[in-house]
Amino acid sequence: MARVKGGVVSRKRRKRVLKLAKGYYGAKHILFRTAKEQVMNSYYYAYRDRRQKKRDFRKLWITRINAAARMNGLSYSQLMHGLKLAEIEVNRKMLADLAVNDAAAFTALADAAKAKLGK
């Protein structure tokens, strides 16, 4: 039986890793070993940051809502509590969008929250 050296398979594996490392800085897109390490790290960062992105956007929305709420004489927590008492269910993403793009609608919601809080 003939000896199989596996050159084709090895080259394909290395080529696949180097293709994934395209655009990386320095040796990380040229040398197989460093490229492989960087690709593995990249997968880790991608997995981690897909979850982090959700947290980051929620923080951004809360910051925007808080800024708009303070313009209407309420804190973020007072606004959210007032909206809950008024039985107005608007998620933070939509509230932040209203705060940025439709100040009049946000003010109407803030006034409804104030009324329920007794302010």
Curated annotation (Swiss-Prot):
Keywords: Ribonucleoprotein, Ribosomal protein, RNA-binding, rRNA-binding. GO terms for molecular function: rRNA binding; structural constituent of ribosome. It holds the Pfam family Ribosomal_L20. GO terms for cellular component: ribonucleoprotein complex; ribosome. Coiled coil: none annotated. PANTHER family: 39S RIBOSOMAL PROTEIN L20. This is Large ribosomal subunit protein bL20.
